[in-house]
């Protein structure tokens, strides 16, 4: 049983009704986690519906598939057009978009047979702020998880793979069991990696800090946008290893991601961060980010892909 969120899903080149988009219970991905995916947002902007950093997301999807040696029949351009098609077909002006490449019913065994193919779906549906609309203004309470991120030579962190998110499930569910809204994972060396499903930033003395990818963090596309926007605002940005206690001593902390957008963190492990609310640097970056969709921030990078162009 599923909750219907839209009317149609793009499935291997065809528009299929939401309730008819089904896979076999013996699909390889269900047993072995053999899938890669993306999370993308379509915003209702001053230019009409726009997909944010569309090409970069589809490039990362292709890159994730390449890392795991999954064959993909569709080009990046074909997947982008499929995204636009499913948004239009569902009459959406703002949406969360979920492209997914997975290994279907190709037989049992960890290694798929020679010459196998993958299945591809793209769903688009309305979805608000991941951690709650009020969290964007008021911030959230987070905790450092007892679960570390895997070392980069065990699970490739550059790939956005379905199986990787079991780690995120452990980090996030532990936080919620203890009354927090989100968890923060450390890397195998005890330094900050990222949130359960978000990249992480700190502000100290007006400087913006974020962990490097070598700390087992996903190369976030929203993270990259924030770094570019911050530099445009004249904010110094440093990518460096960060200790757990730096979270307690930071003036501001926030999480970023397609789903989370830019969510302030008001406390970590019960210790108030800064003033315990959305800080001034975070607010400036939020305004610059959301200003892309109102026209208040110039899109110098060509990040907005118009759905109806």
Curated annotation (Swiss-Prot):
The EC number(s) given in the record are: 2.6.1.42
Q: Which UniProt keywords apply?
A: Amino-acid biosynthesis, Aminotransferase, Branched-chain amino acid biosynthesis, Pyridoxal phosphate, Transferase
Query: Which pathway, per its entry?
Result: Amino-acid biosynthesis; L-isoleucine biosynthesis; L-isoleucine from 2-oxobutanoate: step 4/4; Amino-acid biosynthesis; L-leucine biosynthesis; L-leucine from 3-methyl-2-oxobutanoate: step 4/4; Amino-acid biosynthesis; L-valine biosynthesis; L-valine from pyruvate: step 4/4
Q: Which domain of life is it from?
A: Bacteria
Q: Which GO terms describe its molecular function?
A: branched-chain-amino-acid transaminase activity; identical protein binding; L-isoleucine-2-oxoglutarate transaminase activity; L-leucine-2-oxoglutarate transaminase activity; L-valine-2-oxoglutarate transaminase activity
* A single GO cellular-component term on record: cytosol
Instruction: Write one Pfam family the protein is assigned to.
Output: Aminotran_4
Record-level GO BP terms: aspartate biosynthetic process; isoleucine biosynthetic process; L-leucine biosynthetic process; L-valine biosynthetic process
Provide the catalytic activity annotation. L-leucine + 2-oxoglutarate = 4-methyl-2-oxopentanoate + L-glutamate; L-isoleucine + 2-oxoglutarate = (S)-3-methyl-2-oxopentanoate + L-glutamate; L-valine + 2-oxoglutarate = 3-methyl-2-oxobutanoate + L-glutamate
Cofactor(s) of this protein: pyridoxal 5'-phosphate
Stated role: Acts on leucine, isoleucine and valine.
Q: Which PANTHER family match?
A: AMINO-ACID AMINOTRANSFERASE (PTHR42743), AMINODEOXYCHORISMATE LYASE (PTHR42743:SF11)
* Full protein name: Branched-chain-amino-acid aminotransferase
> Encoded by which gene?
ilvE
